[in-house]
Amino acid sequence: MSQLTHINAAGEAHMVDVSAKAETVREARAEAFVTMRSETLAMIVDGKHHKGDVFATARIAGIQAAKRTWELIPLCHPLLLSKVEIQLQAEPEHNRVRIESLCRLTGKTGVEMEALTAASVAALTIYDMCKAVQKDMVIGPVRLLAKSGGKSGDFKVDAHD
């Protein structure tokens, strides 16, 4: 079984020293969902929200969140991200919005937390913008879809999950 990397021999939380690691291209993708009533989704898709373009605002929020993950999650390293991409797609057949984030860099540590934070904050932004018309929207699940680069190897969610 793998060991927790943020816990030292004394059982204390600490920031992992990555100074000896080689720089490699690292990438991670994550997804989040916001489920809502069909009327709320139609309002977003039709561009009829009085606050403006919900998808554009959520996209910017997700990008900003990825860039600031190190300020939000204790023990995360500040990273020089080379790419953050947020895709939002209405899924009317499920009354939800699917958010997928992609983060990439050339560096010494992975970008999984940045991808997860980006997708999560984009989802929270959709909730924030639409809560006046629907308070019982549901956020989730949020999950890592894939990661590549680094010594722990690649990871990809099973296509059937």
Curated annotation (Swiss-Prot):
Matches recorded under SUPFAM superfamilies: Molybdenum cofactor biosynthesis protein C, MoaC (SSF55040)
Superkingdom of origin organism: Bacteria
Protein name: Cyclic pyranopterin monophosphate synthase
Assembly mode: Homohexamer; trimer of dimers.
Enzyme class: lyase
EC number: 4.6.1.17
Keywords: Lyase, Molybdenum cofactor biosynthesis
Function as written in the Swiss-Prot or TrEMBL entry: Catalyzes the conversion of (8S)-3',8-cyclo-7,8-dihydroguanosine 5'-triphosphate to cyclic pyranopterin monophosphate (cPMP).
Pfam family, one: MoaC
NCBIfam families per the UniProt record, alphabetical: moaC, PRK09364.1
Molecular-function GO terms, alphabetical: cyclic pyranopterin monophosphate synthase activity
Entries under Gene3D superfamilies matching the protein: Molybdopterin cofactor biosynthesis C (MoaC) domain (3.30.70.640)
Species per Swiss-Prot/TrEMBL record: Salmonella typhimurium (strain LT2 / SGSC1412 / ATCC 700720)
Reactions listed under catalytic activity: (8S)-3',8-cyclo-7,8-dihydroguanosine 5'-triphosphate = cyclic pyranopterin phosphate + diphosphate
Protein family according to the UniProt entry: Belongs to the MoaC family.
Pathway in which the depicted protein is active: Cofactor biosynthesis; molybdopterin biosynthesis
Active site per the UniProt annotation: 128
Gene name per UniProt: moaC
Binding site for substrate: 75-77, 113-114
GO process annotations (BP): Mo-molybdopterin cofactor biosynthetic process
